Amino acid sequence: ADIERSIDYVLDPAVAHAPPSWYTESRVYGRMAPRSDEYAAFERSMDYNFQWWLYNQEWEPWYGIFTHGDGKNYFFRNDWYEWSNNEPAMDYMWWMQFMRTGEPDYYRTAEAMSRHTMDVDNTHWPTGPEYRGDTNAALDWWEAKEAPSGSPYVGMGRRHGNQQWTAMLSAHVWTAGWIASYYLDGYHRGLEVAKKTGDYYQRRIFGKHGLTGRRLYLSVWNLVELYDATKD
């Protein structure tokens, strides 16, 4: 029993969090209400949809070294296709519902989905040279100067697809859930990756696509979320 309890502490560690009323009354995420019996039919519908997704994630199963936290979104001829790759801001949806309800399952799902999307569904390599000057200042400067340049697409996300690492697209990356994981989970990696995506949006490398439609609203949303978190 002691061993089982100790393993549970590792697999499902305790989390400090506030009650739903505190999150909703703070207005940090705008106007939203905690779960209430006053709108029972609405709440049942919300619970059904979230539980349906969790059921399918377990049943299929949708988890593994590269897919843990994600799920598929297209059902055709009795089979599921296309990993969601966080489209559109699914981890943020789970964080919001956790704040409304305080449900541990929603917290764990949001946590896993944010960590998956920020590291699997985003572009991290190859990065450009970075001059540090923390060992041999002169040598570091020349090595950084001569190093090959990195990819201009670091920070770009990927759209839904049959593989996790295909279909790179500028209009398919959402930082709101990653920053929520930084606030609610204390996960600094979320803010770190969000900054990389913010840098990408500032470069505005959209290929043949202009700054219109989703690229426009995502640029604004992602950068506003980052500004709120960093004031930079």
What do the PLM-derived regions correspond to, one by one?
Residues 1-232:
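Catalytic cores of extracellular degradative/oxidative enzymes
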